[in-house]
């Protein structure tokens, strides 16, 4: 074995000692041992260094794209923002040739279809400024564009509470309804928490509840306004993420001849509802739905097999880490539990549904629990067991392994559970690093973004990602730093070049990142 990249998802280093920091509070003897014995430093995982707007927190998709590409990958969120800015008359660089949003063929086709069929345009997506799955400003622009195009529009609002404050939905929906009043269109027809509308683990019963509200106007709750929908939910003890699908006022359902514009720019949590609305592979949920004849447009490509019009098609970086490792005749193992499996495969491979020659994939099922604070250890031990077994039996040249716990449990806002999650990962980190070393491999330990390093307060839990620097530890096969120093000022784009150096593979010209070892 030559090298391993171990990603502690959601594990960052918070310089502020005055916050509830689950990473700092946890007993992390293995991490501390490797930090002290190996070369160590920090990496930037947010803002322009990963292709996001300045100050925007990173996330797992962005992180793994940058890690695999070995360069800064301009993110769809920035592309959408810039297209809207051009529509408003601002000058923005346009290396992708996206143009302005009012010239976007896919978006315009939604308006055209609705006009031709005397229908409406239905905007749906996550209504928040979290910036992980969507920006509320993008929705506001679409509503303005609908008014400009003379189309009646309604909104199906999915509330956040995970990448934002658990009760921030009240403010976001207040702003949205005021904007809809101002534009004369785009009012909210349904409200659903992301737990239902944006499930990604094939809990189709949850997705179906959101679908029923949107298509059949059938839900367990009704409200006179979008704001009332969430405040009633708070009274029931459910924060934004868990708002049960609610019908708002007497607004219309999605009907034949209507269009849908799903404005989330991140794909993973938009796929299931999109499949239901477009009737794609309905056997997965027993074919229980019968969607109307509509035109469904997605802001970005949610899945290349869907065949749906896409406003901002993907940019696929070539010569990614996996591709280069494969083309040089080396083998690689990608390993994660369900929650992060797409990240170590699809996103690490540049957002491509491709499995390279010599690429071995192992997926460990995530626990079947409503929220991961109920089982903070998740499947970390099983991930490690699988990794060690694969190292011993297959001896891959490169291992990429993701531990999901600090991120997934951090999102629950439960501080004690997050501490347990960090400690569970630390225990497994010790086992895995020793197994890689025993096989003669170099180890890089890092993270794709922060989360558990800031859990907010008891009264106001913080459930979103952070912009804090993440650790980077280099452990040589002998357990030391191997006489190498970790340079400062690095970012995620520098990990692939570092791994290639450790594997004695020449870095391709397309990778602009630089080795982190001196």
Protein language model annotation of sequence segments:
Residues 1-518:
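Feature captures the catalytic ectodomains and active-site-proximal regions of enzymes
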